[in-house]
Regions:
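Conserved short loop/turn motifs at secondary-structure junctions
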Residues: 1, 28-34, 66-67, 94-98
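Extended, well-ordered alpha-helical scaffold/bundle regions in very large, multi-domain proteins
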Residues: 1-17
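Secondary-structure capping and boundary motifs in well-ordered enzyme cores
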Residues: 1-6, 37, 41, 71, ...
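Proline-centered turn/helix-capping motifs that create local helix->coil transitions or kinks
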Residues: 16-23, 44-60
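Short, conserved phosphate-binding/catalytic loop or strand-edge motifs used
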Residues: 22-29, 195-197
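P-loop NTPase nucleotide-binding/switch module
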Residues: 29, 50-78
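C-terminal interaction appendages of subunits in large macromolecular complexes
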Residues: 47, 81, 85-90, 94-328
Length: 328
């Protein structure tokens, strides 16, 4: 696929404002404007990502395609990132659509799971809007989420759309409104898209039309209302599985526990090694073991002399004394 797919994936991650600090034109998820070319944008891990997403010591590595470098098999993420970001893709015979969820609600759900309490998860969309999640079905196949734009009245003849449904853009909303008007489904005089950092689509209603009826028609005949069908399919232990979002979160929380335990084990090992080295150095100096090597004629003889001199103190240590310890 070349590097285009890498750039597209990076832009999707950056636009969700969680893992990446972005510099340059990264596009706009509200208007659908694309990001600038890869050479014009810059990225770095956010503070959150540096703490939660990457740890060189707990990462499983594999050789790169040419065998000259190493690359991670997976990243040891201590957070249900898949549920926070959402995912949408297809493969041969498989499709997956995982909706994004609220950051704080995911944290609270993880805490509830670890405390043995029940929890429920529902999607939360970066574009806003109002959602009917009564048929969410835990994100599994067969469920559906109905999402509506937020439409308010400015005056009797003016409507404003300030939030849009997930999977739409202000451009697609505007186009659908114009098409509905051309077909006679709604009656408007003008529609303007003034969106920048926030959604703002202004609709001028025809003088002979009720604004309430126009709002109903917008939901019925335009992209102001869409239905999204989730289909949570994930790769678990190298095989595809259809799992509900609650089960995905449980497994993520348990994996995070394992990763934190692994980090503590590694840190404990490092501290034990530091204590071992400091203890050997102290024994060597305080007991003047360096005097044992003064008459030695070879390096091997000196190593043996030091090892023998350490013999009375080995019971105090937490592990055996190795040749590398003596050489140090």
């Amino acid at each position: 696929h070349g590097d285009a797919s890498i750039k597209d994936a990076l832009v999707q991650l950056g636009q969700k404002d969680l893992l990446i600090d972005c510099q340059g034109n990264w596009g706009n998820i509200l208007t659908g404007d694309e990001a600038a070319a890869g050479r014009y944008i810059e990225a770095r891990l956010s503070k959150f990502a540096s703490e939660v997403v990457f740890n060189k010591k707990t990462t499983e590595w594999m050789l790169s395609y040419d065998g000259r470098k190493e690359e991670p098999v997976t990243l040891p993420i201590k957070f249900p990132l898949l549920l926070a970001q959402g995912s949408d893709g297809i493969a041969v015979g498989l499709a997956s659509k995982i909706l994004p969820h609220n950051f704080v609600e995911l944290i609270n759900a993880c805490i509830a799971h670890l405390e043995g309490r029940e929890f429920q998860l529902y999607p939360d969309f970066p574009t806003g809007g109002m959602a009917d999640v009564s048929r969410y079905n835990d994100g599994l196949r067969g469920g559906a989420v109905k999402v509506r734009a937020k439409i308010s009245k400015i005056d009797k003849r003016t409507l404003a759309i300030t939030e849009i449904p997930y999977t739409t853009t202000t451009e697609s909303i505007k186009d659908s409104i114009i098409k509905a008007n051309d077909k006679g489904k709604i009656k408007i005089r003008k529609v303007d898209d003034n969106t920048a950092d926030k959604v703002e689509i202004i609709i001028q209603v025809s003088p002979d039309e009720s604004s309430d009826k126009t709002i109903d028609a917008l939901y019925a005949f335009t992209d102001c209302e869409v239905s999204i069908s989730p289909n949570a399919c994930v790769i678990w232990e190298e095989k595809p599985h259809f799992l509900g979002v609650s089960e995905i979160l449980r497994r993520s929380a348990e994996h995070t526990k394992w990763l934190l335990g692994r980090e503590l084990e590694i840190r404990l090992g490092e501290l034990n090694e530091a204590w071992h080295a400091a203890s050997l150095e102290r024994i060597f100096i305080e007991n003047k073991l360096y005097q044992l090597i003064e008459g030695c004629k070879s390096r091997e003889e000196a190593y043996a002399a030091v090892d023998k001199g350490l013999e009375p103190f080995k019971k105090r240590l937490r592990r055996e004394v190795t040749l590398s310890d003596v050489q140090r």
